[in-house]
From Swiss-Prot:
Keyword Protein biosynthesis part of the UniProt annotation: no
Biased composition (Polar residues): 42-52
Gene name as annotated: rpsD
InterPro entries, sorted: Ribosomal_uS4, Ribosomal_uS4_bac-type, Ribosomal_uS4_CS, Ribosomal_uS4_N, S4_RNA-bd, S4_RNA-bd_sf
Protein's UniProt name: Small ribosomal subunit protein uS4
Classification via HAMAP family: Ribosomal_uS4_B
Cited function: One of the primary rRNA binding proteins, it binds directly to 16S rRNA where it nucleates assembly of the body of the 30S subunit. With S5 and S12 plays an important role in translational accuracy.
Protein source organism: Variovorax paradoxus (strain S110)
Length: 207
């Protein structure tokens, strides 16, 4: 399936939650009413979603949030299932370790899509080496930086300024002046994505 290129606010409306696909420069609540589905008439009241429907919707929500397609998402799940510990939490830890997500968390991109573009356009280095693979999995202690020739991009400066206002997650350390940061650790489950019910995804793939 091809990557979705349509209106981002429509996806957040469909899922009934902010998927953080738009920059925080403008509140996404101003762009979309989360209490109604896309379409002329919105959500039909009185309809009960099946267990399978809930599981599928949760998977779709997480895929869209992190910008991952089905084939790769399935591979992440299989890897998460092989690891020790909770499969659902492991899945989210893998997603959080993607380079495009770490670039976003550090504030170099205002959205994951923008961060993915920075990686793809070779604007990002890992431990001093250029890496242009958004799905590259960052390890604890890795240093992520914006390449010197890309530091003057207005969008990066604006994203960093915004990130400083909103707050940088505790599991990354960022030097905004140098446009570089360190991936200190994989975050604890209670440190992020409180609105994700990963157990529904595990149930779906365990059918």
């Amino acid at each position: 399936m091809a990557r979705y290129l349509g209106p981002k606010a429509k996806l957040s409306r469909r899922e009934g939650t902010d998927l953080f696909l738009k920059s925080a420069r403008r509140s996404i609540q101003d762009k979309a009413k989360f209490d109604s589905k896309p379409g002329q008439h919105g959500r039909t009241s009185g309809q009960r979603t099946s267990d399978y429907g809930l599981q599928l919707r949760e998977k779709q929500k997480v895929k869209r949030m992190y910008g991952v397609l089905e084939k790769q998402f399935r591979r992440y799940f299989e890897e998460a299932d092989r690891r020790r510990g909770n499969t659902g939490a492991n899945l989210l830890f893998i997603l959080e370790s993607r380079l495009d997500n770490v670039v976003y968390r550090m504030g170099f991109g205002s959205t994951r899509a923008e961060a993915r573009q920075l990686v793809s356009h070779k604007a990002i280095t890992v431990n001093g080496q250029s890496v242009n693979i958004p799905s590259y999995l960052v390890k604890t202690g890795d240093v992520i930086a914006v390449r010197d020739k890309s530091k003057k991009q207005t969008r990066i400066a604006e994203a960093l300024q915004l990130a400083q206002q909103v707050g940088i997650p505790a599991w990354v350390e960022v030097n905004a002046d140098k446009a570089e940061g360190t991936f200190k650790k994989v975050p604890d489950r209670d440190e992020f994505a409180a609105d994700i019910n990963e157990s529904l995804i595990v149930e779906l793939y365990s059918r």
